[in-house]
From Swiss-Prot:
GO cellular component, one term: nucleus
UniProt protein name: Interferon regulatory factor 5
Entry keyword annotation includes Ubl conjugation: yes
Function (record text): Transcription factor that plays a critical role in innate immunity by activating expression of type I interferon (IFN) IFNA and INFB and inflammatory cytokines downstream of endolysosomal toll-like receptors TLR7, TLR8 and TLR9. Regulates the transcription of type I IFN genes (IFN-alpha and IFN-beta) and IFN-stimulated genes (ISG) by binding to an interferon-stimulated response element (ISRE) in their promoters. Can efficiently activate both the IFN-beta (IFNB) and the IFN-alpha (IFNA) genes and mediate their induction downstream of the TLR-activated, MyD88-dependent pathway.
Positions of region (Disordered): 121-142
Crosslinked positions (Glycyl lysine isopeptide (Lys-Gly) (interchain with G-Cter in ubiquitin)): 412-413
Record note on modification: Phosphorylation of serine and threonine residues by IKBKB in a C-terminal autoinhibitory region, stimulates dimerization, transport into the nucleus, assembly with the coactivator CBP/EP300 and initiation of transcription.
Gene, per the UniProt record: IRF5
Species of the source: Bos taurus
Tree of life domain: Eukaryota
Phosphoserine found at: 153, 294, 302, 432, 436, 438, 441, 447
The keyword Ubl conjugation is assigned to this record: yes
InterPro entries on file: Interferon_reg_fac_CS, Interferon_reg_fact_DNA-bd_dom, Interferon_reg_factor-3, SMAD-like_dom_sf, SMAD_FHA_dom_sf, WH-like_DNA-bd_sf, WH_DNA-bd_sf
Amino acid sequence: MNQPAPAALLPPRRVRLKPWLVAQVNSCQYPGLQWVNGEKKLFYIPWRHATRHGPSHDGDNTIFKAWAKETGKYTEGVDEADPAKWKANLRCALNKSRDFRLIYDGPRDMPPQPYKVYEVCSNGPAPAESQPSEDNAEEEEEEELQKMLPGLSITEAVQPGPAMAPYSLPKEDVKWPPTLQPPVVLAPPAPGPNLLVPAPGNAADFGEVFSEVLPSSQPQPGSLSTSLAPTGEQLLPDLLISPHMLPLTDLEIKFQYRGRPPRALTISNPQSCRLLYSQLEATQEQVELFGPVSLEQVRFPSPEDIPSEKQRFYTNQLLDVLDRGLILQIQGQDLYAIRLCQCKVFWSGPCASAQGSHPNPIQREVKTKLFSLEDFLNELILFQKGQTNTPPPFEIFFCFGEEWPDCKPREKKLITVQVVPVAARMLLEMFSGELSWSADSIRLQISNPDLKDRMVEQFKELHHIWLSQQHLQPVAQTPAMPGLSAAQGPWPMHPVGMQ
């Protein structure tokens, strides 16, 4: 009589991730795996890092192990337990799936209850017969790139005008800075709060826009940059009582070429920056072409390390029309964009008017509002009070030369840029218990302490909420309305931690 093959030798099973994972969230049998709200579109998934948070004894009841068993990659009593591999398998499945989108990528440091937030996408995956297999994925990638050039969004070239003064070229080739140590900039003070901001979406004359957007700024007496290293419990109320200590002008910028590792840097210029790809240098005589010279000039990385020849060709097609660039401008506590370049730019973010999968373009030479710190603080207060179900968004995504948002995953776009206002991220991480502090973690800059009364009131209210949370004891039951504070995570706390 033939004996059945050992379980460990059985081939892995093909399992549809979406129905299986949705069923597991509904089952409530895995600690921390639960819906964010009643709409069942967003869910928390615990994401503990064993190397950071120490060993855990909850590994026998995790969604990662369940997925390994479901797909036949782990058999109890036969295979050796490997929680790290289980986690990697599920992470890869989520990243490849079109049914899920990562909304919140988890903490940067060591909170007591780390997690991620995923969205269940309404757009289902492509039919099985159209899904590329591993064998022909590279071939289909080449075919897809071959079809991209006619669809690239580049503004029609304008008729040449009067001859301009010769461009000045840099003396040396510009090297990509993020391969070096991230820059630390001692910034001059930010523009005063009395500057008036034109209504977003209104076209403006170039000279008028730039004179209003970026007035000459002279250092003020007493302006200083301070490195602080107190404990998190001491620093948080200090920052909320003295909001001028927050890096309000800092932006984290992350460049991403399709399929390539992202390259990131932090900008600390209070007049912000211009994203460009060119060896032409901005001069005082060419403000209408390239914007003010006081902007930090941030160049896109070279595409030369893109291995695919076709992808590199199409990427260069877009970079070649990014000479004039995209200006990111901080005015007061708001972030704006002005598109100068011929390459069309699409975006998504907190202030985007288009919702869902409808493309959202940035009109050329029109100031577009991207982010409002005041609105973010209002939403953060409501979230901490339990009056809203999700934390306020603050990340901004740009897609160059292709429509966005649309049904195509962001990872498939040729050129994308993510922009994060550092102050917003810090505030959310503080109230999530996700931010650890060290002497070299951040250089906090004091530049303009005269903030509007309304913003001061917002910080005072946030400070009051934080103090109230310190007196709360951890609860043993899952809260009806999960929050992100250090004292109350989105799932019950366990004495031995979570795997």
